[in-house]
Structure formats: structure tokens, C-alpha cells
């Protein structure tokens, strides 16, 4: 098997209505830290935390990001309880907040401090 399916990546589960700017900033934040992302359209939708938890469960790196239609983002680790994400942005998130969410996910993967 070849292609991105073999490459470990932080999975980004996005609701079909996710604003493009949110997705762009989140992925840029992770990639700035040297961690690749793989974007998956989540057909069932859901809130950012539920999407992030599902992404973390499916990721070979045990880390996932969820993006909902409102523009909220959540970062999750596969070993955390579903409603206990590692980080979230609110509905009033800014591009800096979304990029920080991507960096946070990458830093969890690398085992670095989040601050």
C-alpha cells in the first residue's frame, strides 16, 4: 500500500460546513511544527469535540482535531475521555486561535509543552 494512508498524520475531521479559513489555519499550525495533517470530511457532522475524539481514535498518532460548522476547533488525544479534549477554541475564534490549535495538536504528538 502506498500514499498518504501509510504516512502517520494528525487526522482533521471537519464538518462539511467548516469555514475554509479555519481549516487552512489549523493545518498550517500543525505543519509549522513539522507534523503532517490529513483532512477527512465527516459526513455525520457533530460538534468539534466529538469530531476531534473520533479523529484521535482513528489516528495512528492518537491525536485528532475536530472542526465544526460554527468554526470551533478541538484537539483531542485518543486516551482522553470524549468530553475532555486537550484544547478547544470558541465560536469567536480568530485565525491565531485556529493556528494555535494546529500547533497544540502537533506538540501533543511530539511530547512538547503546550505553552
Q: Where are the regions a protein language model picked out?
A:
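Negatively charged, low-complexity tracts enriched in Asp/Glu with abundant Ser/Thr
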Residues: 5-53
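Short N-terminal or domain-adjacent regulatory/targeting segments
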Residues: 1-3, 101
Amino acid at each position: 500500500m502506498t500514499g498518504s494512508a501509510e504516512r502517520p498524520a494528525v487526522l482533521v475531521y471537519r464538518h462539511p460546513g467548516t469555514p475554509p479559513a479555519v481549516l487552512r489555519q489549523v493545518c498550517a499550525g500543525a505543519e509549522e511544527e513539522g507534523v503532517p495533517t490529513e483532512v477527512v470530511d465527516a459526513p455525520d457532522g457533530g460538534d468539534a469535540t466529538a469530531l476531534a475524539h473520533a479523529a484521535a481514535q482513528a489516528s495512528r498518532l492518537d491525536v485528532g482535531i475536530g472542526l465544526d460548522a460554527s468554526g470551533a476547533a478541538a484537539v483531542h488525544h485518543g486516551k482522553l475521555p470524549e468530553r475532555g479534549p486537550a484544547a478547544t477554541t470558541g465560536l469567536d475564534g480568530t485565525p491565531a486561535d485556529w493556528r494555535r490549535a494546529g500547533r497544540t495538536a502537533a506538540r501533543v504528538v511530539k511530547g512538547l509543552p503546550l505553552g
